[in-house]
Amino acid sequence: MRAIVLTLTFLLSFAAFAADDKPPTNAQALELARRWLDAQRAYDEIPGMSAAIVHDQKVLWSGGTGQADPTTNRPATADTLYSICSVSKLFTSVAVMQLRDEGKLTLDDPLSKHLPWYKLPAAEGGREATLVGVLTHSAGLPRESDFPYWTGEFDFPTREKIIERLASQQPLYPSDRYFQYSNLGLTLAGEVVSAKAGKPYDQFVRERILQPLSLTSTYPEVPLDEKGKRLAQGYSAKRRDGTRTPLPLFQTRGIAPAAGFASTVNDLAKFAMWQFRNRDAKSDPVLDPRTLREMYRPHFVDADFETYWGVDFATWKDGGTVFVGHGGSCPGYRTAFQLDPEKKVGVVVMANASGINTGRFAKAIYDIVTPTVKNEATTAPDLSAYTGSYDAFPWDGETIVVAWGDGLATVDAPTMEPMRTLERLRKTGEHEFRRVLKDGSLGETYKFEIGPDGKATRVWVHSNPYPRM
């Protein structure tokens, strides 16, 4: 419909509106986020997605769209398990910082101090890799252990094989000079955790992080016994013909501290709420609040001044807002974990397909919902007769119509920037609305036809009908 309806300008997230128009409620924004996510997933041909958004200590919404396993029609839900891959690194870094706070190590320690078998020489002009170097991906280490585990059957090496092969690997760069994302580095950080804790890495993480935070659906390794049950079936990126291929299930074995975990959006929502709770606390049984703030703070800035990294938290600024978090990408799975610490808003998005950007999905949900998190519910007319999706063929996919304040709003789909396509509609007559321009003036008319059940069957805009889907 966007090619038919003349738009004066793209709207910013919540453009100025006339005094007659009430601001949207949080419930209305959540409904738009849910409808948009469902539509965008379908247009991107992603089998299934799950998402959650939290504000401080409240889960505003969590749910799923599509299918966790299309072969059995098992739906994706907020409790569907996905590989979260590199989000695993956050748990590893928390474990390292717990041991640091106990005086068992320092971030400036060279790896060889705690791992006697670590023999990689320093690159010319650099120093030996340190803990802070691996936790900020600035140690100059290779990206991977020297095995081809990201292709073929995803045959990840055991820790014994990683240690054996490490002896023949070399640093890529001098330490502290370049940002070089390294799964090998975080794998070694996990080995330090095990060495200093005196117990297996997974046991330490369960006892010190997962159990205290009641993360009952988070696993340090993909649980194979959940295949066909709660675990989503992973799919490849799309091929040229638009198809996706189901991928074999894997366990990351020795790479688990860097990429092994599986979780649900509901559990990572708990992880987000703990961080918001921790941030304002004087003490915390899992991690000193001062330490969490230290982890958020950038510890390495790349020479391009575009890449900032905390203690394994990525940190970035978008439109004046500072975000922290991490992404995850394993064969058949993508995850985004994004936090706005100041507003205490967190978004988690998981998908069972490669070749997509879950971070963009998370940011779109954030943009829709965050401006409304403090908006109280107000009495508004029942406009449910008009809400839904209307077919914009052949010019577009569809137009989503939702209640918005005391009127309606439309969003065109597909789009990865739903708030930039949002148009507000004001009721001006029986089943009749007009578009509200940025300056509050009224534009074209939207006339809804009502069927026998009292629901709209189509909407007329610029003398053209668009049927309800």
Can you say where each PLM-predicted feature lies in the sequence?
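Active/ligand-binding-proximal structured segments within catalytic/core domains
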Residues: 92
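The feature captures the short pre-catalytic strand/loop hairpin that immediately precedes
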Residues: 160-172, 238-253
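Mid-domain, small-residue-enriched loop/turn segments at the edges of structured enzyme/sensor domains
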Residues: 130, 184-185
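Catalytic loop of the DD-peptidase/beta-lactamase superfamily, centered on the K-T-G motif
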Residues: 19-63, 149, 153, 164, ...
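Bacterial N-terminal signal peptides
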Residues: 5-15
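A short, polar/charged loop-to-alpha-helix boundary motif
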Residues: 68-77, 357-364
